[in-house]
Amino acid sequence: MRHGDISSSNDCVGVAVVNYKMPRLHTKAEVLDNARKIGEMLVGMKKGLPGMDLVIFPEYSTHGIMYDTKEMYDTASAIPGEETAIFADACRRANVWGVFSLTGERHEAHPDKAPYNTLILMNNQGEIVQKYRKIMPWVPIEGWYPGDCTYVSDGPKGMKMSLIICDDGNYPEIWRDCAMRGAELIIRCQGYMYPAKEQQILVSKAMAFMNNTYVAVANAAGFDGVYSYFGHSAIIGFDGRTLGECGEEEMGINYAELSMGLIRDARRNGQSQNHLFKLMHRGYTGVIHSGDGDKGVAACPFDFYKQWINDPEGAREQVESFTRSTIGTAECPIEGLPNEAARS
């Protein structure tokens, strides 16, 4: 893991993250014009960072947030489509991989159902290698249709990569699912705003450590007329230590070289902090000393996860028993969301 140079090597993937200024757009033409700006930024960055293998742009960087529902549906993208064609041209010209946000992607039943909040991982030939739909839209505000699975794909130089989006990162299950699929770099694109700066910086570092994985965070910056975005795009080592981090500046860039050999060695030879291995070999020292085998315990000890798999409605009722039974809350109502007062 190296930070401070502009190079890379056969062992190291050069990764850049961008504090892209949150745009405020209204039409398809404006979205396409902004996509071209992203493409030109990518090409320009490669001139300054010759080792850059992968550049990551934040959630909402292409479309901005469409606060008007009609605009949100009217500007929703097909994938592949006009926006991805622009990105593909830029990736080919720069010989660089990219992660790009499409908010939204048209639902299969468009316009009868809400769009998805989608990320794509595109290779240096302009081909879409991974398309990820946000599993945990930021309710109650975001109106995206939720996705239903994570993915792992071979990225530049063969590094295993997963995409997650913003509020996804507040759920440890998503990180663990990516890591247990073999992800070596989990890419979190976000459009996170104040007041959650401290928590979001903390959670990405903690999840890198807990999942023995590199993490790259690309976050928006600036003010879009509604929210103020705190930036702090960052690249984090698999030991949870920050390699490089932007401040709050608009269009800030940070860059680091991520060694594949180091993370693979750590996962193979690490012991006390090898969380992925230890989770599936629980208590192996005591089990071995007790004569009960040489692998530890593999069985899941967590009742909640067992119930969630086998009885999702029952698991939901259990959570509602100590939270609330309606989507909304009468003490801070949001239009369109049922709450206890409305129900009564």
UniProtKB/Swiss-Prot annotation:
It comes from the Bacteria. Keywords: Hydrolase. Disulfide bonds: none annotated. SUPFAM superfamilies: Carbon-nitrogen hydrolase. GO terms for molecular function: amidase activity. InterPro entries: Aliph_Amidase/BUP, Aliphatic_amidase, C-N_Hydrolase, C-N_Hydrolase_sf. It catalyses: a monocarboxylic acid amide + H2O = a monocarboxylate + NH4(+). CDD domains: aliphatic_amidase (cd07565). Its EC number is 3.5.1.4. Residues 13-260 form the CN hydrolase domain. Transmembrane segments: none annotated. It holds the Pfam family CN_hydrolase. The active site is at residues 59, 134, 166. Catalyzes the hydrolysis of short-chain aliphatic amides to their corresponding organic acids with release of ammonia. Also exhibits in vitro acyl transferase activity, transferring the acyl moiety of short-chain amides to hydroxylamine to form hydroxamates. Belongs to the carbon-nitrogen hydrolase superfamily. Aliphatic amidase family. This is Aliphatic amidase. It comes from Variovorax paradoxus (strain S110). The gene is amiE.
